[in-house]
Curated annotation (Swiss-Prot):
The keyword Signal applies. Glycans are attached at N158, N159. The lineage of its organism: Eukaryota, Viridiplantae, Streptophyta, Embryophyta, Tracheophyta. InterPro entries: AB_hydrolase_fold (IPR029058), Peptidase_S10 (IPR001563), Ser_caboxypep_his_AS (IPR033124), Ser_caboxypep_ser_AS (IPR018202). Its EC number is 3.4.16.-. Residues 1-25 form the signal peptide. This is Serine carboxypeptidase-like 48.
Length: 510
């Protein structure tokens, strides 16, 4: 197996692997981060960093104060990024200070030393807009890529200055980005036991964070709430939706007004989606019919290994084996296709990671920016190999299984996918959505496929029945809000407002 093949295995369906700069990509091949005393984050160093964060209380949060009450678990501050264009409203542009922009750390209660970092941007339009949380995949990649390159309030330029994103999702929502699982982005821990290994741990941490968030921001408790994200978040999102729904049913803490969840180019049902690789690659003329037939023989082995992983309860050697066996399918396609960009097959892969997102890394590692965000001396981590490896046994789990109960209770699901993405392609997503067994399956399968219009032009194809909507987005790859920002914003708005629901077959338009 050559180095390129090995590298592609590591990157399969990661949401942000492509944004490592040349200087950071080296870390992927180095020894993974260890939390032992002799490793790169020794306990004493971590303690120094923790005490240095200006978002943190003056004493460690585990210390009980004189009145006997615990120091706050969630510590947040408003921020004003120093490199924002027209940051004071000159030239008629909105001022950063005109909107509520917050960054904070949350100390996870079921951990020894874990802090979860997040951004919160109040709506530019109406504070009564829904609250939307965005989760990036990986596993172990930071949500800041989506913030600065896809659907956040700002875009970042070559000179590390910021400008307003005309199609930021904060135009339609109060928007949260979380660095999770712990160890991702600006989130951190000094204890290896805080790393999560499955969706139970991940979803419980996020649920605890949301409880603390709404306690900090009670004015948003009654707003509608939606969970969104991309790629490996096809695992995170259904798990969190189920956790929130269960918490609401059991009357755990604050009721979260969950209305729906949206998965973009996600990995949700690996058994079905890996079976779509050969078909999609053939449709895109990346492989020949003979290649396709050979790959389908590999898929039979992959399918069996996933079933064995499921029989083991998502643990053990069977899951490790299924990860290796199934990823051979993708590796073989890339060996045949050559230098194609696996996030957008219309393009060639430039450099080892196909895209260059180094502007974000350079910006977030500026001292002035870290000071504004209150993250002390921590270096921004784009993707964590330690988190990735900790979650590896979770990879082949089927997260579709919890979705039918959510649909049955009226919680909406939007599955959308850019048509030119290979790695988490629209075909595989369409297949699992159509094959999912739920009360409306027959009607959904029979529903008409209709155009999705933006500016009176067809921007995608969609179908809907009841709480379920599927949308194939034209002229987009893996990252739909980056490739088609206007269509992505309109998609979000229409979906939250019920305008993507077209049971009568009418087209969805603004």
């Amino acid at each position: 197996m050559d180095s390129k093949t090995t590298f592609l295995t590591f990157l399969l369906c990661i949401f942000i692997f492509s944004h490592f700069s040349p200087s950071t990509s080296k870390s992927l091949t180095e020894k993974p981060l260890s939390f032992s005393p002799s490793a790169s984050l020794p306990t004493l160093t971590a303690e120094r960093l923790i005490k240095g964060f200006n978002l943190m209380p003056t004493r460690d949060v585990n210390v009980i104060d004189e009145e006997g009450s615990e120091a706050p678990r969630l510590v947040e501050r408003a921020f004003d990024l120093p490199a924002a264009v027209d940051r004071r409203g000159s030239g008629g542009s909105p001022s950063v200070q005109d909107f509520g922009h917050h960054a904070g750390y949350y100390k996870l209660p079921n951990s020894k030393a874990a802090r979860m970092f997040y951004f919160f941007f109040e709506s530019r339009t109406n504070k009564a807009d829904p609250v939307v949380i965005w989760l990036t995949g990986g596993p172990g990649c930071s949500s800041e890529l989506a913030l600065f390159y896809e659907n956040g309030p700002f875009t970042v330029s070559n000179n590390s200055s910021l400008s307003w994103n005309e199609f930021g999702w904060d135009k339609a929502s109060n928007l949260i980005y979380v660095d999770q699982p712990v160890g991702t982005g600006f989130s951190y821990t000094s204890d290896q036991s805080d790393l999560r290994h499955d969706e139970d741990g991940v979803s419980n941490d996020l649920y605890d964070f949301l409880q603390a968030f709404f306690k900090e921001h009670p004015q948003f408790v009654k707003n509608d709430f939606y969970i969104t994200g991309e790629s490996y978040a096809g695992h995170y999102i259904p798990a969190l939706a189920s956790r929130v729904h269960r918490g609401n049913k059991n009357k755990e803490g604050t009721h979260i007004n969950l209305k729906g969840f949206a998965i973009g180019n996600g990995l949700t049902n690996p058994e079905i989606q890996y079976g779509a690789y050969a078909d999609y690659a053939l449709d895109m003329n990346l492989i020949t019919q003979s290649d396709h037939d050979n790959l389908n023989r590999y898929y039979a082995t992959c399918q069996q290994s996933i079933k064995e992983c499921s029989a083991d309860g998502g643990e053990g050697d069977a899951c490790a084996s299924s990860y290796t066996v199934c990823n051979n399918i993708f590796q073989k396609i890339m060996d045949i296709a050559g230098n194609v960009n696996y996030y957008d097959v219309r393009k060639q892969c430039e450099g080892s990671l196909c895209y260059d997102f180094s502007n974000m890394e350079n910006f977030l590692n500026q001292k002035s920016v870290r000071k504004a965000l209150g993250v002390g001396d921590i270096e921004f981590v784009s993707c964590s190999t330690a988190v990735y490896e900790a979650m590896q046994m979770d990879w082949m789990r089927n997260l579709e299984v919890g979705i039918p109960a959510l649909l049955q209770d009226g919680i909406k699901l939007l599955v959308y996918a850019g048509e030119y993405d290979l790695i988490c392609n629209w075909l595989g997503n369409s297949k699992w959505v159509h094959e999912m067994e739920w009360s409306g399956q027959k009607e959904f399968v029979a529903a008409a496929t209709v155009p999705f219009h933006v500016d009176n032009k067809e921007a995608g194809l969609m179908k809907n029945y009841g709480s379920l909507t599927f949308l194939k987005v034209h002229d987009a790859g893996h990252m739909v809000p980056m490739d088609q920002p206007k269509a992505a914003l309109q998609m979000l708005q229409n979906w939250m407002q019920g305008k993507l629901s077209t049971p009568t077959g009418r087209t969805a338009h603004q």
